[in-house]
A protein has these predicted regions:
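Jelly-roll (double-stranded beta-helix
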Residues: 1-96
Length: 96
């Protein structure tokens, strides 16, 4: 199976106590607006985080909008937010 590169836009608000748990995958998260605690590190607008382990994303006091790139097996499903106060849009899927 060919690998797939996916780009998501995640928006987490502060209206709810939310956290987004992501499974272990090679990924890169760029914070577009606001800030977030990603893997215990505060990442602000214009900054990025990268890693391959399981990670938790929590919005900062003003919420967060981020772009998330993930490299996965082609037969793996999408990793999307599914709780109040969170929304994910899959922007791009490219089979490599």
């Amino acid at each position: 199976m060919h690998p797939v590169l996916r780009l998501y836009e995640d928006v987490l608000s502060t209206a709810e106590t939310v956290e987004f748990r992501l499974p272990p995958l090679p990924r890169f998260i760029f914070v577009v607006h606001g800030s977030a605690a990603i893997g215990g590190r505060v990442v602000k607008a214009g900054e990025a985080w990268q890693g391959e382990r399981e990670v938790v994303v929590r919005p900062g006091p003003e919420g967060v909008a981020c772009w998330r790139w993930e490299l996965a097996r082609g037969d793996a499903g999408s990793t999307v937010a599914s709780a109040p106060g969170m929304i994910t849009h899959e922007k791009l899927t490219a089979f490599l």
